[in-house]
């Protein structure tokens, strides 16, 4: 069976959508889960019901909760969660040409003298 190429998503990643929603709402004490979902539904062409688990997962991991517990709380953007501009792509380093290893030399075992037992009387 041939693999089909998946179509590129028509929306940005959930992480960026949630962060822009929280920043766009500009609520002083943080934005609620419902408000974040409404903002995403209004500004992006997505099915929020399908993205709900991903939104919840991102909020748990990257966003600071200011009030309440779970979905009933308010959320603010963590300073670390704000997406930073990516640095210029690094050029891949030239691969070093490995020299073929010479065959390992076999060690010849020297003839050893047999150990003599000491008489302990």
Swiss-Prot record:
Gene3D superfamilies named in the record: Winged helix-like DNA-binding domain superfamily/Winged helix DNA-binding domain
Domain of life: Eukaryota
Limits of the H15 domain: 10-79
Cellular localization per UniProt: Nucleus; Chromosome
Pfam families reported in the protein's UniProt record: Linker_histone (PF00538)
Primary localisation category: nucleus
Keyword set, alphabetical order: Chromosome, DNA-binding, Nucleus
Basic residues: compositionally biased ranges: 82-121
Chain intervals for the UniProt region annotation (Disordered): 64-121
GO molecular function: double-stranded DNA binding; nucleosomal DNA binding
Single GO biological process annotation from the record: nucleosome assembly
GO cellular component, one term: nucleosome
Entry keyword annotation includes Cell inner membrane: no
Family, as annotated: Belongs to the histone H1/H5 family.
Described purpose of this protein according to its UniProt entry: Histones H1 are necessary for the condensation of nucleosome chains into higher-order structures.
UniProt name for this protein: Histone H1A, sperm
């Amino acid at each position: 069976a041939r693999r089909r190429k998946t179509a590129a998503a028509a929306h940005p990643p959930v992480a960026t959508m949630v962060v822009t929603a929280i920043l766009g709402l500009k609520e002083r004490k943080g934005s609620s889960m419902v408000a974040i979902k409404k903002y995403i539904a209004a500004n992006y062409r997505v099915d929020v019901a399908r993205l709900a688990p991903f939104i919840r997962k991102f909020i748990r991991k990257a966003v600071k909760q200011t009030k309440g517990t779970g979905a009933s709380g308010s959320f603010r953007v963590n300073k670390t969660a704000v997406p930073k501009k990516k640095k210029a792509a690094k050029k891949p380093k030239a691969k070093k040409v490995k020299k073929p290893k010479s065959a390992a030399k076999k060690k010849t075992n020297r003839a050893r003298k047999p150990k003599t037992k000491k008489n302990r009387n």
